[in-house]
Amino acid sequence: MLEKTTRMNYLFDFYQSLLTQKQRSYMSLYYLDDLSLGEIAEEFDVSRQAVYDNIKRTEAMLEEYEDKLVLLQKFQERQRLVAKLKQLLSEEEHVNEEMKQVVEAIEKLD
């Protein structure tokens, strides 16, 4: 569950500008502010089921955006490559060719 929440938070950060105001509000309250479906429903004067349906549709939309734009995947790969580069730089014997390959891989992501 925590893994899904973390993924949704990342996807929301990357793609929130593509959502409607209502979708942004529901997702923000549910994932960032940790409100329950009932609390959100009460705040917007709608049913709990309406909030649930909206959040599920929005989650599916965020996954579709990620499938097409792969911003999260590129971000995670960039983080992995930067961590590897830092590790290589901290080692006593630098492997120049390997560092060049890591830098080239980072450049290709952009």
From Swiss-Prot:
Pfam families: UPF0122. Disulfide bonds: none annotated. Transmembrane segments: none annotated. Belongs to the UPF0122 family. Might take part in the signal recognition particle (SRP) pathway. This is inferred from the conservation of its genetic proximity to ftsY/ffh. May be a regulatory protein. This is UPF0122 protein BcerKBAB4_3669. It comes from Bacillus mycoides (strain KBAB4) (Bacillus weihenstephanensis). The lineage of its organism: Bacteria, Bacillati, Bacillota, Bacilli, Bacillales.
